């Protein structure tokens, strides 16, 4: 839940600077998270049916579970990685003309959240990589669509020139 202030700030930033043009962007951002989460949680996890490392009997003595509990849901793919990479790639591809190199911070954020899933012992590295690839693909496709269908420009912020 520590990510909520960042995303609330981003939504306010977009609403203030892009006005009515922000609404398609916000809707597609929400759709991006919805698609990444649903495909990860309701398609891939049941299909692959891989247990989390914290439920693996062979690894139980070697896992340090920092949360104190281990979810009963399946492990592949990491929905956290899918969701955050979906959002990160979507933001990067739609707002990079305004944020330029600062756009990379959203990818760093997604990578940090994803690494955290391995660090706390609830995902294998390939779970996170699979989630990152899923999220990146969906985020990129959603950004392609919105960039073509709803061109994004702000009367308040000039695009950064290369």
Spell out what each predicted region is:
Residues 1-9:
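The first (N-terminal) embedded transmembrane alpha-helix
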